[in-house]
């Protein structure tokens, strides 16, 4: 059987697994005013891609920043740097997928523009428009100009930002785990593999809410250590092992068998046990452990991060208004 090539962000089906196996003590909806006087870090690129896809980058970034500050939440926006070389193959595949989506979108647009839409049923027309919208989101690109616009807006608000050397997720996890921030706002499921203590997902600008994931509580309810959880997720397929022929459901089934093993084998690790008792692991154990190591924050040695104090600077309301007016935002 050919290995499945994984190109989606984060661990596939992890969110479903957590929701099915954890209680509201670990995963619950909260209003943002519950975070008053707390600091948060934001994995910025996720929201930039989303807001660009909605043709509302500056408007929604303005609303997000305003929402946090109006609830007395002190944010730090973390920007991605250069991806690690271990992701080169994945990034090539994603670029190809973007091109395919763009070609298909352009073909559909051309077809839609020449057909008589009155001959389509309401359902057919809706389905075609939905597919084009979905395709357009698949080839969204963030430009350097987009990044500079957002940074200028952050400066105008007096909000701090940090340029990561590599990707933002490990920096966000480090800042939360070290106690410099209370939680991370991100929809990337990799945050749990890093052991980020608290993650805020599905932030809603409309309902001023988010879903709070408490990682220590999650691990407690799953009866797993952070190390075991990370090993399970890495074996199930990450951005660093895209050719693996494994998945989360099967890995969990094998882990359940491992925990029910003969108690005389207490010193054997999960990977070692799998290697001896199955053909589920097809790669070298050392390679898997090296990937696990990539999902730790111990390699972060930036003195600026060690001494960082997340706080607000004075805001420039006239600059905020100028920037937003230039972006077409109408103040009421």
Regions found by a protein language model. Give the residues of each.
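Non-catalytic nucleic-acid-binding/docking modules located in mid-to-C-terminal regions
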Residues: 2-6, 24-36, 71, 208-332
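Noncatalytic, basic helical substrate-engagement surface that gates or grips nucleic-acid strands
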Residues: 3, 7, 12-17, 21, ...
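Short, hinge-like loop/turn segments at secondary-structure boundaries
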Residues: 93-96, 180-182, 201-204
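Short acidic loop-to-helix transition motifs that present clustered carboxylates
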Residues: 166-171
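Acidic, metal-binding active-site segment of PIN/NYN-like and related structure-specific nucleases
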Residues: 172-200
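A polyampholytic, Gly/Pro-enriched intrinsically disordered region
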Residues: 182-190, 206-209, 222-225
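Conserved NTP-donor binding/palm subdomain of two-metal-ion nucleotidyltransferases/polymerases, i.e.
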Residues: 191-194, 198-199, 204-212, 216
